[in-house]
């Protein structure tokens, strides 16, 4: 018995210690019996920050949020059985949004598998193709070889999570009872440790000089170019993309998640209203570029994606440091396997300064005309959902974070988050674009990002109410703006809206919930606002005081649709007039 406890303690102690040596210092733990030894060791290790979350589905997204904000791997730990299955949605999101998670599941030992033992199921490859690596760990043994094995496996799994494309990995730990480690053992954390940590150093792909010369030569003869920036994890992309735009004269179509629309860099070449003006069919048909250079994930904007598809005669250069480039439009003619930063640096160094031409001036002109029209909604007194975004940005302090939920909030952020000299970081879950786990992800991000404001619809808010517990347990600061249109507002913009007979029951889905009581149950403050001045004041108050603050603004789905369409129609008239003026 003592040999088992000693082996368990040293073997798992070596694993936990190696995680911290590799800078995996945050773990989200859901309570359970079989995971007891790992949980206790993690709690005991001075280098590990532990976060408890009872609901595994919420816990998975909470860890995802920390990892997204910290840009470092975060560990997840749960017991065996369906607890592990509840991580699945967060693992899927992490895989497609390229976020490193270290998923740790405890398991029954081999003699208790497939024999009807309680809380035992097949956990081999549980997450299928949504993890970069699955490893079944060996049972604990008291030997130097096994302690080295624990550390080396940790090094491999963490390295894999961090290598491009980053993503989740899964370690399954079978353990036998008894499950309590012996903390009185000497040198508990030192077994298998060498003087040097086995860190896998990730290098940058260097583009061959011949290719750079060829690229620069071609670009210098392509006047009509665009730089399209989607969701990007590189903090420096704003500086380098804008420098490349200045050299080439190519406008930057900046998705809000690129974080190029705000900050202290030069935004002369940044186009922020393309989602609206690219709805103009004539413009989409007649504005044909020579080259499109794309960084990061695909943009939120559907009209931009349609525009990209129509650029059949252009050279499409997709820059992606992994072999899994993102091109749902299926138009890539050239894939450069390098980081966005390295690509920009190489091109900037050798690129001559190209003169601004009619192409870039045309994009800038239409963008400004569109923005002038869209800004008319800032005078609206009615509860327009687009104004939620502009008014939040108006009161957010420097270095704040705006987290946009999926469905309508991220689309309104795309349309109404205009360029700003304030440094505001925008986040969202755009891997598989689900409405689940949004509260939990935002709360995870708030561990690192403070202040943080989440904009979320009422259905998405309902979907992850359990996530609010993290704010109470870990004393987190967050302001949540609930845009309550009593249902699925996005469906009013889709063809389903025309099927009136079944629209409300199948798509509108009003649920008629009063969220005030549940917010107070989790120790938060709740405010239902009745005007824009009160709205701005409540958001401002939330960002300057501690704790959980929920601000609800009630809107009408039909009225919101009408206001969006009115703005689009006005913009189309302005664009048509501008295009006619240019053609004379």
Curated annotation (Swiss-Prot):
Co-factor requirement: Mg(2+); Mn(2+); thiamine diphosphate
Co-factor binding details: Binds 1 thiamine pyrophosphate per subunit.
Name used for this protein in its record: 2-succinyl-5-enolpyruvyl-6-hydroxy-3-cyclohexene-1-carboxylate synthase
UniProtKB keywords: Magnesium, Manganese, Menaquinone biosynthesis, Metal-binding, Thiamine pyrophosphate, Transferase
Biological process annotations from GO: menaquinone biosynthetic process
Keyword Manganese (UniProt): yes
GO molecular function, one term: manganese ion binding
Catalysis performed (reactions): isochorismate + 2-oxoglutarate + H(+) = 5-enolpyruvoyl-6-hydroxy-2-succinyl-cyclohex-3-ene-1-carboxylate + CO2
Role this protein plays: Catalyzes the thiamine diphosphate-dependent decarboxylation of 2-oxoglutarate and the subsequent addition of the resulting succinic semialdehyde-thiamine pyrophosphate anion to isochorismate to yield 2-succinyl-5-enolpyruvyl-6-hydroxy-3-cyclohexene-1-carboxylate (SEPHCHC).
Range of residues in the leader sequence: none
Pathway of action: Quinol/quinone metabolism; 1,4-dihydroxy-2-naphthoate biosynthesis; 1,4-dihydroxy-2-naphthoate from chorismate: step 2/7; Quinol/quinone metabolism; menaquinone biosynthesis
Source domain of life: Bacteria
Provenance organism: Bacillus cereus (strain ATCC 14579 / DSM 31 / CCUG 7414 / JCM 2152 / NBRC 15305 / NCIMB 9373 / NCTC 2599 / NRRL B-3711)
Family per similarity comment: Belongs to the TPP enzyme family. MenD subfamily.
Pfam families cross-referenced by the UniProt entry: TPP_enzyme_C, TPP_enzyme_M_2, TPP_enzyme_N
